C-alpha cells in the first residue's frame, strides 16, 4: 500500500494542499476481465500476462518433386474517384487491379514461343526476273551493227562526209544514189525504175512498183523495219543539198549529177 503525501506549492499568496485520505491502491487499478459469449474470459483484458508461445511444426525434409508453387497474389488498393484519385479513400469503390496474366477484352491469348529452340534456315530469295525482250530487241542484240540508217538525215550526213573526203580509213558504205545508179546501169528491176534521158542522167520510178523497189533498198541496207517509198523519197530530196541527185519537175522523176555518170552517158 502506497500513500501519497501531501504536497504544498511554495508561493507568497497561493498554496494547495491535497486532501488527506486520498490513497490509490494499485491493485484496484487492475483491469477486470469480462466473460465473452462462450463463457471464457476475453483475452484482450489479460494484458499483464505473457502470450502463449506458438507451436513450432516439426521439420520436414523438402521434396522438390512434390512441392507446388502458386502464383503471387496481386494486392488491390482502393482509390477514391473524386477530384484527387491518387489519395486513398476507404469509402471508394474497390476496382480490380489489372492483371498481366489475364487478357483484356478483345485480346487473343497466344501460347508462349520458345525462341531459343528455333533455328534459322537458309533464306530463300526469289530469282530476279529477267526482262522479257521483244522480237525486235532480240534481233538487235544478235545482229551486227547496221552500216546505213534509213533516215534521210543520215543520208545527208553520209553525203556531206563523202563529199569532203572524210571517209579515209573507214569502211565504205553503200549509199542510196549508188544503189539506184547501179540498178540503172545493169538494167535490173526495170519494172520499178528506168532511164528517161540516159545521157542527162534522168530516171523515173514506177508508180505501181515503187514500193517493191523501196523494200529492196531496205533489204540491201539490212533494216529491221520495213522500208517505204516515202522514206526513200525523203532521202532523195536530201541529196539536193550535196548535189548527187536533184528533183525534176515531173512526177517520180529525178536526175543524177553529171559527175556521177560514165563518160559514155554524156551527151
Curated annotation (Swiss-Prot):
Region (TAD2) residue spans: 41-62
GO BP term (any one): immature B cell differentiation
Alphabetical list of InterPro entries matching this protein: Ets_dom (IPR000418), ETS_fam (IPR046328), WH-like_DNA-bd_sf (IPR036388), WH_DNA-bd_sf (IPR036390)
GO MF annotations, alphabetized: DNA-binding transcription activator activity, RNA polymerase II-specific; DNA-binding transcription factor activity; RNA polymerase II cis-regulatory region sequence-specific DNA binding
Major location category of this protein: nucleus
Region (TAD1 (Acidic)): 1-31
Expression tissues: Expressed in the medulla of the thymus, the spleen and germinal centers of the lymph nodes. Expressed in B-cells and T-cells, expression increases during B-cell maturation and decreases during T-cell maturation.
Xref: Gene3D superfamilies: Winged helix-like DNA-binding domain superfamily/Winged helix DNA-binding domain
Localization in the cell: Nucleus
Keyword DNA-binding included in the entry's annotation: yes
GO cellular component: nucleus; transcription regulator complex
Entries under PROSITE patterns matching the protein: ETS_DOMAIN_1, ETS_DOMAIN_2, ETS_DOMAIN_3
Listed SMART domains: ETS
Regions recorded as binding DNA: 174-257
Keywords, in A-Z order: Activator, DNA-binding, Nucleus, Transcription, Transcription regulation
Subunit field text: Can form homotypic interactions. Interacts with IRF4/Pip. Interacts with JUN. Interacts with TBP. May also interact with CREBBP and EP300. Interacts with NONO/p54(nrb).
Homology family: Belongs to the ETS family.
Domain remark in the UniProt entry: The protein contains a weakly acidic N-terminal transactivation domain (TAD) followed by a second TAD rich in proline, serine and threonine. Each of these domains may be required for transcriptional activation of a subset of target genes.
The name this protein goes by in its record: Transcription factor Spi-B
Organism: Mus musculus (Mouse)
Gene that encodes it: Spib
Amino acid at each position: 500500500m502506497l500513500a501519497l503525501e501531501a504536497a504544498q506549492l511554495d508561493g507568497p499568496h497561493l498554496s494547495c494542499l491535497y486532501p488527506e485520505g486520498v490513497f490509490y491502491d494499485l491493485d484496484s487499478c487492475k483491469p477486470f476481465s469480462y466473460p465473452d459469449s462462450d463463457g471464457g474470459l476475453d483475452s484482450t483484458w489479460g494484458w499483464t500476462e505473457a502470450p502463449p508461445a506458438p507451436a513450432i511444426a516439426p521439420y520436414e525434409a523438402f521434396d522438390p518433386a512434390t512441392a507446388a508453387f502458386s502464383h503471387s497474389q496481386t494486392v488491390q488498393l482502393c482509390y477514391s474517384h473524386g477530384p484527387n484519385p491518387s489519395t486513398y479513400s476507404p469509402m471508394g469503390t474497390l476496382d480490380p487491379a489489372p492483371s498481366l496474366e489475364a487478357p483484356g477484352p478483345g485480346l487473343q491469348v497466344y501460347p508462349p514461343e520458345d525462341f531459343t529452340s528455333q533455328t534459322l534456315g537458309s533464306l530463300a530469295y526469289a530469282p530476279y526476273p529477267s526482262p522479257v525482250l521483244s522480237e525486235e530487241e532480240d534481233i538487235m542484240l544478235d545482229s551486227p551493227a547496221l552500216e546505213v540508217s534509213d533516215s534521210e538525215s543520215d543520208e545527208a550526213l553520209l553525203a556531206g562526209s563523202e563529199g569532203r573526203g572524210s571517209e579515209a580509213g573507214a569502211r565504205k558504205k553503200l549509199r542510196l544514189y549508188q544503189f539506184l545508179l547501179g540498178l540503172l546501169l545493169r538494167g535490173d528491176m526495170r519494172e520499178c525504175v528506168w532511164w528517161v534521158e540516159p545521157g542527162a542522167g534522168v530516171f523515173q520510178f514506177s508508180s505501181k512498183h515503187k514500193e517493191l523497189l523501196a523494200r529492196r533498198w531496205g533489204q540491201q541496207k539490212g533494216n529491221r523495219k520495213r522500208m517505204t517509198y516515202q522514206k526513200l523519197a525523203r532521202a532523195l530530196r536530201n541529196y539536193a543539198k550535196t548535189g548527187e541527185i536533184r528533183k525534176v519537175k515531173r512526177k517520180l522523176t529525178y536526175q543524177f549529177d553529171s559527175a556521177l555518170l560514165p563518160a559514155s552517158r554524156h551527151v
